[in-house]
């Protein structure tokens, strides 16, 4: 899978731990089927990627798709992959949870049955199949919690019957992605169903630099003698600073303790890309005004960070603390105190 990241969005760069776990869950069972049988080891039925939004869950799933499409799987179960078998390619079926919700009675259940029927048909030909469900929390919400509708309470049993039913899911694996794992019905997450749960958290400093490196490259208009990687490092260290200039607000946890929240605490791969895009947009506008290629400089990048910081800080005054903390994968927050 890691080799396929080159062709994917690089907001998952340097996520070796997450990639390693999903490789063990998805790639190993398909590539070494005979060894799994030799050790009487059942591959997991499903994997759940969860964590705060904008940090590469869907991109990791795309990397899985690329790996499947490249082939190289043990189609006959003898553990050997011959040149001919190398062309046995996997199938990746992708759907967003909200797309399956339908106001007509029984229609959502029919769509779920159809997806798994297609998966079984393709798996019967010896192709490994991954069914990817994005925004899984919108489809499989906890029953009886007061946040699920009548439609959703019938969808969960249908989904579970596809996983556990009489028709086996040989050669089929389900991957789900969710920002709100707390809203998914616990029955879906029990052992024997979505066995592997992988948290895709916020990027650390070195990961953030690798992400920005993908969008700040040496072929862009830069000042003479300026290295794009050095610009990335300067940008990230500005974002991850914990001084007053990057202070968003103070938050009160359930135990009553207050602590400061900084821009670094809410950063995501999507935010990093957005900041770089802000700087590029500024450069484009200045280039239009001057008729020259305006270089991406430290001051230009700093201005982009400042714009992102101000927008994020101002938005904190209007959020619901409990809901905001859940969506962003944080411990529960009782109150938010912003600067006057």
Q: Which role does the model predict for each range below?
A:
Residues 1-7, 12:
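Single conserved hydrophobic/aromatic residue that forms the stacking wall/gate
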Residues 13-45:
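Pre-Walker A (pre-P-loop) alpha-helix and adjacent loop at the N terminus of AAA/AAA+ ATPase modules
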Residues 39, 173, 251-340:
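C-terminal engagement/docking regions of AAA+ P-loop ATPases
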Residues 43-94, 117-122:
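Walker A/P-loop
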Residues 70-90, 167-170, 187, 201-271, ...:
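Conserved C-terminal "switch" segment of AAA+ ATPases
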Residues 79, 107-131, 154-166:
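Conserved alpha-helical scaffold flanking the Walker A/P-loop in AAA+ ATPase domains
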Residues 79, 83-86, 97-110, 139-154, ...:
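Flexible beta-alpha connector loops of hexameric P-loop NTPases
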Residues 117, 133-196:
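Conserved catalytic/switch belt of AAA+ P-loop NTPases
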């Amino acid at each position: 899978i890691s080799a396929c990241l080159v062709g994917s969005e690089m907001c998952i760069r340097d996520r070796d731990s997450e990639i390693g776990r999903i490789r063990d869950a998805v790639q190993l069972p398909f590539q070494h089927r005979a060894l799994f049988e030799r050790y009487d080891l059942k591959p997991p039925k499903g994997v759940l990627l969860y964590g705060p939004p904008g940090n590469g869950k869907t991109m990791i799933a795309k990397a899985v798709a690329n790996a499947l499409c490249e082939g190289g799987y043990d189609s006959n179960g003898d553990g050997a992959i011959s040149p001919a078998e190398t062309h046995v390619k996997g199938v990746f079926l992708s759907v967003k949870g909200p797309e399956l919700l339908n106001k007509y009675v029984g229609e959502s259940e029919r769509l779920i049955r159809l997806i798994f029927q297609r998966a079984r048909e393709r798996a019967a030909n010896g192709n490994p199949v991954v069914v990817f469900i994005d925004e899984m929390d919108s489809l499989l919400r906890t029953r009886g919690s007061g946040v699920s509708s009548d439609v959703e309470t019938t969808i969960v049993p249908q989904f579970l019957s596809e996983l556990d039913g009489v028709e086996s899911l040989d050669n089929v694996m389900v991957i789900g992605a969710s920002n709100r794992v707390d809203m998914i019905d616990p029955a879906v997450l029990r052992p024997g169903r979505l066995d592997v749960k992988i948290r895709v958290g916020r990027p650390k400093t070195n990961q953030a630099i690798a992400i920005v490196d993908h969008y700040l490259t040496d072929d862009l208009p830069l000042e003479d003698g300026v290295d794009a990687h050095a610009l990335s490092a300067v940008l990230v260290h500005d974002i991850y600073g914990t001084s007053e200039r990057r202070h968003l607000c103070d938050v009160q946890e359930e135990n009553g303790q207050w602590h400061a929240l900084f821009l670094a605490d809410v950063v995501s791969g999507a935010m990093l890309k957005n900041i770089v895009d802000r700087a590029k947009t500024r450069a484009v506008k200045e280039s239009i005004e001057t008729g020259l290629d305006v270089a991406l400089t430290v001051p230009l990048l700093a201005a982009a960070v400042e714009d992102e910081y101000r927008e994020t800080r101002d938005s904190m005054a209007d959020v619901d603390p409990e809901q905001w903390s859940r969506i962003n994968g944080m411990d529960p927050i009782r109150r938010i105190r912003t600067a006057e």
